[in-house]
């Protein structure tokens, strides 16, 4: 249950962080700049970057496994 609460809090923080530019309150309030010190553009590009890294690593591992299994069949 504790893990679920932490995940919900992180998701809520991320959603608020990514919606700040829509309501134009990113730099207007000092409390907001303390809670969200990094620009909201990072909130958009971070998942894209992580997905690219994940797909690259997954593809690399699958490629190595396919090459190794093909070499074993030939021997």
Swiss-Prot record:
Compartments (UniProt record): Membrane
InterPro entries per record: DPM2
Transmembrane feature ranges: 5-25, 42-62
Pfam families registered for this protein in UniProt: DPM2
GO molecular function: enzyme regulator activity
Keywords: Membrane, Transmembrane, Transmembrane helix
Entry keyword Cell wall biogenesis/degradation: no
Disulfide bonds: none
Source superkingdom: Eukaryota
Membrane topology classification: Multi-pass membrane protein
Subcellular location, principal: membrane
A Gene Ontology biological process term: dolichol phosphate mannose biosynthetic process
Record-level GO cellular component terms: endoplasmic reticulum; endoplasmic reticulum membrane
Name of the protein in question: Uncharacterized protein YIL102C-A
Species of provenance: Saccharomyces cerevisiae (strain ATCC 204508 / S288c) (Baker's yeast)
